[in-house]
Amino acid sequence: VVVGDFDSLEGRPPRTDVRTIALPALKDDPDMLSALKVGWSAGCREFHVYGGLGGRIDHTISGIQLMALLARHGASGYLYGDGLIVTAITDGRLSFPAHPVPEDGRMVSAFSHSDVSLGVNEPGLKYELKDGTLTNTVVQGVSNEFRDGVDAAISVEHGTLIVTFPIEVALPQVSRFHEFGGDIGELDTAVSKLLVR
């Protein structure tokens, strides 16, 4: 499925042999959220967004917020770009298998997306935070490091963390501490009602 408003497309429109959902350019939901909603309605609960980092900073921040939205509904999302992966976890754990770590591929960071994240643990990392509290106004989780050949994890008992790690690292196993409900909303194909005409 190809989803978008195609407002920045140069050249020919998308292939006609692929299901295409064309959205109005003057809408409320960004294209990425619309694409996630289409996937969600088809039963997807793990999303990989390539090219979701870099370019416009507002799009990058939007993508990070969407990873948090997915995590808060019990799904997983990964933004890929410039040698980095960004994901989010809510009330759960990301377990990274032991791996050889090149000197330039050690950095892993965790930031609180929620106002407060409680019970944050980072076993196996260079700085092993235990039962910590992170907030979204104080930076405490930046530039931690994987250790060569050591299993590692990042977990949060209550709250949402944004986690960044090198693209060379295998995706973590995700476990959640409880069931999540709800959905991320229905696809909105209408022109924004907030538009000033």
Named regions from a protein language model:
Residues 25, 84, 115:
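Residues that form or immediately flank small-molecule/cofactor binding pockets and catalytic motifs
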Residues 17-18, 43-45, 73-76, 105, ...:
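Short coil/turn connectors at secondary-structure junctions
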Residues 19, 24, 74-78, 105-109, ...:
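A glycine-rich helix N-cap at a beta->alpha junction
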Residues 12-15, 42-46, 74-77, 116-121, ...:
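Generic detector of short, locally flexible boundary/turn motifs and exposed helical patches
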Residues 1-73:
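Acidic/Gly/His-enriched mid-domain segments of enzyme catalytic cores or analogous surface patches
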Residues 50-52, 80-81, 111:
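Short beta-strand segments
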